[in-house]
Every structure is written in structure tokens, then in C-alpha cells.
Amino acid sequence: MTQITVKALSEEIGTPVDRLLEQLADAGMNKAVADHVSEDEKQKLLAHLRKEHGDATGSEPTRLTLQRKTRSTLSVNAGGGKSKNVQVEVRKKRTYVKRSSVEDEATREAEEAAMRAAEEQAKREAEEAAQRAAEEKAKREAEEAAKREAEAKRMAEEKAKRETQAATQPRSDEEKLKQEAARKEAEALKRRQEEEARRKAEEESRRQLEKVRELAEKNGERWSADKETVGDMQENTDYHVTTSRYAREAEDEADLHEEGARRRSTKANKRKMSSRDDNQERDSRPRGGKAGRKGRINKPMSMQHGFDKTAVVAKADVVVGETIVVSELAQKMSVKATEVIKVMMKMGAMATINQVIDQETAQLVAEEMGHKVVLRKENELEEAILSDRDDKFEEVSRAPVVTIMGHVDHGKTSTLDYIRRTHVASGEAGGITQHIGAYHVETPNGMITFLDTPGHAAFTAMRARGAQATDIVVLVVAADDGVMPQTVEAIQHAKAAGVPLIVAVNKIDKDTANPDNVKTELSQYNVMPEEWGGDNMFVHISAKQGTNIDGLLEAILLQAEVLELKAVKQGMASGVVIESRLDKGRGPVATVLVQSGTLRKGDIVLCGQEYGRVRAMRDEVGNEVEEAGPSIPVEILGLSGVPAAGDEATVVRDERKAREVANYRAGKFREVKLARQQKSKLENMFSNMTAGDVAELNIVLKADVQGSVEAIADSLTKLSTDEVKVNIVGSGVGGITETDAVLAAASNAIVVGFNVRADASARRMIEAENIDLRYYSIIYQLIDEVKQAMSGMLSPEFKQEIIGLAEVRDVFKSPKLGAIAGCMVTEGVIKRNAPIRVLRDNVVIYEGELESLRRFKDDVAEVKNGYECGIGVKNYNDVRVGDQIEVFETIEIQRTID
């Protein structure tokens, strides 16, 4: 047995020595580099690797090849009376294939099905033959009865005719009476014969029907007993149809059934069966074959009558979940998947057999095919776990949640900054709030929770999320700037959420301030001040100097008293995720605003598709807290992943059920997203075919918080045009990793980091692959540079600019160049290699290029305005006096994204 060392084996198979030693150890063989490896150990390692890669049957070879060598010596005559010995080697190679039990089972089932089909065919043919025989007999008896009746009628008519002839020559009254009596007697005899014939026919048909019923009952009992016997024998007998003997027997048996059926049909067609008893006796005898063969049961081949029942397709109820695969829907309706696809195409939707469709589409398709649909609710567990809460406590007053909204640089963060007596605005990049900040402050009149939302257009989704979680909206409007687009959006969000609006007119300390103009502009959007008869409070403030900030707080608390805000302080907490991010040292971090109950350290929290136990809680200044009540924002640690901003955070009892609900939500989100992506209508087919002409700018986006990722991705996607499409191939929260760099290299994308940086391994990968990496801290710069990159991908526009015009004064003939136009340059300059147009009566009649440009018989590169020259137009000789020659050049204009 050949043995080689571990090092030699690693060189032979091209695997590092360390990796090979690990694989040997996993297979249960501890080896060193210098140890030997036998063939058995190689096979053991190979079987382990196959099993590890998913090939569970890899250790059992299904094909065995045997090679044999036979050596012999042959004596050959070499001539001259000498002989020499020749070594002869005979090589034989034989391959044995192990057939799987599944194939054996399939073969046996196929043969059994063939046998059953042959038996059914024979039984059906026998029934048809018996039925035909009964019909022939009844028909024959009816014909005989009709013949007898016709004969009796004919005899009666002849007798009556004779009597009539005799009656034409009456001789006396006595003879007349005799004739009348004879006629009546003949009529009575005729009626008795008809009644007797009808009675006999009825008795015969009744007797036939009774015998047929008895025969059917007797045969039915015997056939059921035979079927049970055959089933028991098939269960107790182990047929190895792969062996030659049993395969031959099964084939012979099938041939016998086929031959018997053919022979019976031939005999039935050749001659009529005259007697029902003979028919029954013949049908009850076994046909052909070896009756004594083991495992064979002789069965009756036919019966008299067959009873057919109309087959009706069963229309079962189809249970449809929120999403379903086309093949699964077809299986539930007991039809082929191609039929379902045809119906969907008729309804205007294209689908494949493995495509996921939504519940509404599946319902329409099933009802179109005549089935009753039962819609299944798949979130029963989710509803059960969310309803299992101990929130039956008394409601108490809570602090208002106030959202500061407004346009960019109108002073939102500065206003909140002055209230909290901190300087957060200076820490934000560019003085612009990049993500939601949640703070609660204590005032002399009570506690207020503030949410600071970004103001520029990219963060519309974040601002809408802030409006959903808030009680009062403070709209900050600069007195010197007035109403701006983001101001209008903030008003719309507040009205959509049904939240009362307080207007803070900021920057009133400036000389250009005009508060009345702000009121007038806001009144156009149904924001009316109280002094004008409206419902909105207007407060004039200056965030820079702190003017009337206390008045703003009083207005907020006054509005909160009117709203009578209450919440359950005890029990299991629920709230909303304001912001989320991935911290390098602490993992997923979510900012949660508690809306009811008390959130405690150690609670099990379910947030959208994520779950986990609260390991730590921090307030807005970073201090550890043990619990948080209503209207208190806290940062929680311990979730399984980064939840989406805006998800509902709920405390549940069971961590296992929370994991099930989170996994169900993740799977449902994936299925719905897949169904939305794969949906393709017939009317969009041609637009999908032409989509290959669109240039794509692939981007891998990483940001510090989830809200920034959503806002930036939405803004970049909106930049897409018909010619350039922005494709976000990957996005996430946290630093730029090596995985992001690999994704960017594979998809030819640029990597964009917003307030994040790349780690060392990612930087090495980016340098090696020459990937474009860009860092940003202000979203305006990010969007502008992406616009520039998209502009570079646009196909340029070309513009033709006229640079010179010459008038033809005379025409000369040249044997070498043809017609030469003697011209005077009237405008611009005539260049030698520029394209030209020939104009006649200000109409273009030819477009081409110059072949010759001369001045005083000298070739020149250009001729300026006011000089004469000779121009030869290439491939054009129809130049006339008075024509104009226009010289132009094509200029490329770079397009930009607006």
C-alpha cells in the first residue's frame, strides 16, 4: 500500500499544509507534517470532505470498476526449427453500477401499474362483450315476437277477408249470425295472443334483469376478495424486478393479459353469442397462461353490465397565504402550472413557475379558474404576542413630545440649543443637523421632550417620522427669509399627522426682519394666527439672544394642557425607534422614545425585524439609567441587529416567541420585496427590453445612522434620469468594511461614506482594486458630486458652428480637380480641412468637404475675411457663380444633470 507524507499530499492536491492538517483533524486523524498517510486514510478524508460539502452519500460508491490482468506464455515458431516464448497479457475491465432503491421502487410501481391497467382493460372489454350479447338477444327476441304477431295478423286478415267474401252472398239470417260470431271470436283470439306475447316479454326481461343483478353481486364479492388476496401477496412477496427471472415473469404476465384481451375482442366480433349461460360459462373460465405459477391469481375476465359515473373535477377550497409560489398555487388547485401561467397572461401578468405572487393576484387567478379562495392570516403569532400585555393600569399625565421643524438655517437647532443651554449646533457638520436628536429638558413649569429634525429636502422621511411620534410641532420660520419649500413640507407633515402647530418667528433681532410678512405667507397655507381668528399661536423669538424663549415654552405647555396628554406609566413599555446605528464597540444602538409603560434594563424588546434583551440604557447625555417612563428618549443596547428607524418597539414576555416573530417579519419582508421586484406587466415588456441602453452609476453607501442611509439613498435614487440611473448596490450602517470593498469591486461601484471611515483591511482592498472612495460630512456636497459623476456619464451633445462664408465670383475648370470656384471670403475664415455646405439662393444643395484651397496658386491652410481664394469642392462640379460656400465645424457640448 502506497504511503506519502502529509507535506507531499498537500503539494499534490494543491492545498496549504495547515489547511490539510485541519481537515485531517476534523476527520479524526491527528497528523504531523512528516507523518505518512495511507490509502485508507485518504479515503476516510475524502468521505469526510464529501459529507461536509453536503454530499451525504458521497462515502458510498455507486459505481465499482474491477480490472483484471491475466498473463500467459505462448510458444511461437520463429523459423529454422526454433521457437520462442511470447508473454501475453489479457486485461479485463468490468464496471458494476449499484442501482438505487428509488429506481427499483419506481420500476416495480410502473410494472404494477401496467398489470392493473391490463386487468382493468380486460374487465372492461368483458363487460362490453356481455352487454353486446344481452342487447343482441333482446333484439332477436323482439324480432321473433314481431314476426309471430305479423303472422297472426296476416292469418286473421285472410280469415276476415274470406268471411267478408262469403258475407257478400248472404243466403239467410242464420248464416249472418254465424259470420258475426266467427268475426268476434277471431278478434278475441287476436287480443289474447297479443296479451300473452306482451306478458311473456315482460317476464323474460324481468328474469334477465334479476339474473344480471345476482351475477354482478356475486362477481363483485369475488373480485373484492381477489383484490385483497393479490394485495396481501404483493405485500408479502419481495419482487426483485432487477433480476432476470422475475423481470421475465412480469413481462410474460403482461403479454398474457394483452393477448387475452385481443383474443376476446376478436371472437366477439366474429360470431354472435346465442346463449347467456354459455356466455357466462365462457367468461368465468381463466384465459391462457400458466395457471399454476406462483403468485398468480386467476380472475374473471368480464361481467354482464358496467355502471359508469360521470367524472366531475373536485373544486376544493384553495388556502392562500400572503405570498405564494405559482407552482404551489397550481398544486393546490390540482392543475398544471402552465395552465396557471396561461390564465395570468390572459389577465395581463407575466410569471414563471417559481415566481412569488402576492395574495391578491393569487386570489384573482384562483377565482378565475373556478375555485373558492380562503385567505389565511399568517401573523396570528404576532398578534397574539403583541396582545399579551399587562397594560390595565391607570393613565397619568405625561410630558409633551415637541418636534422642532423648519427650513434649513432658520434656527431650529439654535432654538433648542438655547433651551437646553448647550452648544450642539456647533458640533454638527456645517451647522446642519444630520440626524434626529432626542432630548428631554426640565423647565420650571414641567418637563418637555424635544425632537430636532433636519430641515433640508433630503431628510423628508426623517421629518415625517418625527411628526408621527410627536404631540406638538414648533415651526421655526426666519423673519428675514419667510416661507421656504421645507417650511411648506413641515406644515403638510404636521397636518397629515393631526398635530397642533406653534409658529416660532425667529431672528426678529435682525434689521431685515418682517414678522407680519411671515404671517401673511403662512396664511396662504391655512396657518392662521390667533389674533386673526385662527388656531395657531405665533411667538416672536430670537434664538441668538434668547429673546422670548420663555414665552415659547409657556405656549408649548399651554397647548399640552389643552391636549390633556396621558399615558400608562406602569406595565410593559412600548415606543418608537427614533434613530438607530451600528456602534463599533457596542454593537447595534437604537434611540427609542417610550410612549407608554416603563422600559427597564433586562426587558425583552421586539423592534421590527430585530429583537433582544436590553443590556444597557443611556440617556441623551450618555448616563446609565435603569428605567425610562413615557416621553423619555433613551439609547438601548442588546438588539440582534440595527432596526429601521420608525419601527415600533414593544416589550414582550417570551424571547423565543420574539425571535419567531422577528424571523417571520424578515421572511415576509423578503418575500414581498421579491414579489414586487419580479412583477412584470405585458405593457412594460418593450420598456424593459430597451433598458440596456441606460448607463448605471453603482454606489455602495455607508452612513452613521439608519435615518441618514434612508434619506441619502432616496435623494440619490431621485437623481436618476432616462439616460443615467443611480443604482444603490449596497447600503448599511457603520464603518466601511472589506466586504463593502469587495462588493464595490465586483459591481464597479464607488464607495460613499457619510460620517464613517474605512478600516485598515478595507483601505488595503480599495487601494489594490483602485476603487473610488469618497468621504462626506455634509449631504449637499455628496449630492453635488454624484451629480457631477452622472454628468460625466451622459452622452455629449454636438453643435455645428459656422466659422466662415465665401461667395463664388467665377468658376474655372481644372483638368486635375474639376470645377474650381473663385471666391471672396465675406465672413469669418475659410479653413482647409473643415466641412462645407454649398448654398444656392440660401438653400443648401450640397454638403461635403474642401478638396483644395489656394491663394495665388499656393496651397494655404486658411483664408481670412476680405481675401480672394480658389476653392475646390470634393466630388462636386456643379458650382455656379453666385453660390455661397459655408464653412462650419462641430463643437462638443458637455451635458450636466440639473
From Swiss-Prot:
Keyword Transmembrane found: no
Segments for region (G2): 431-435
Region listing for G3, in residue ranges: 452-455
Keywords: Cytoplasm, GTP-binding, Initiation factor, Nucleotide-binding, Protein biosynthesis
InterPro entries: DNA-bd_dom_put_sf, EF-G-like_DII, EFTu-like_2, IF2_assoc_dom_bac, IF2_II, IF2_N, P-loop_NTPase, Small_GTP-bd
PROSITE patterns: G_TR_2 (PS51722), IF2 (PS01176)
Segments of this protein annotated with the region G4: 506-509
Biased composition regions of type Basic residues, renumbered to the chain: 263-273, 287-297
Compositional bias annotation for Basic and acidic residues: 100-164, 171-230, 274-286
GO terms of biological process kind: translational initiation
Keyword Cytoplasm among record annotations: yes
Ligand binding (GTP): 406-413, 452-456, 506-509
Subcellular location: Cytoplasm
Comp. bias regions, Polar residues: 234-245
Stretches for region G5: 542-544
Region spans: Disordered: 51-302
G1, as annotated region: 406-413
GO molecular function: GTP binding; GTPase activity; guanosine tetraphosphate binding; translation initiation factor activity
Domain called tr-type G: residue spans: 397-566
One GO cellular component, as annotated: cytoplasm
Xref: Pfam families: EF-G_D2, GTP_EFTU, GTP_EFTU_D2, IF-2, IF2_assoc, IF2_N
Top-rank taxon: Bacteria
Similarity comment text for this entry: Belongs to the TRAFAC class translation factor GTPase superfamily. Classic translation factor GTPase family. IF-2 subfamily.
Functional description taken from the UniProt entry: One of the essential components for the initiation of protein synthesis. Protects formylmethionyl-tRNA from spontaneous hydrolysis and promotes its binding to the 30S ribosomal subunits. Also involved in the hydrolysis of GTP during the formation of the 70S ribosomal complex.
HAMAP family: IF_2_B
Protein name per the record: Translation initiation factor IF-2
Native source species: Vibrio cholerae serotype O1 (strain ATCC 39315 / El Tor Inaba N16961)
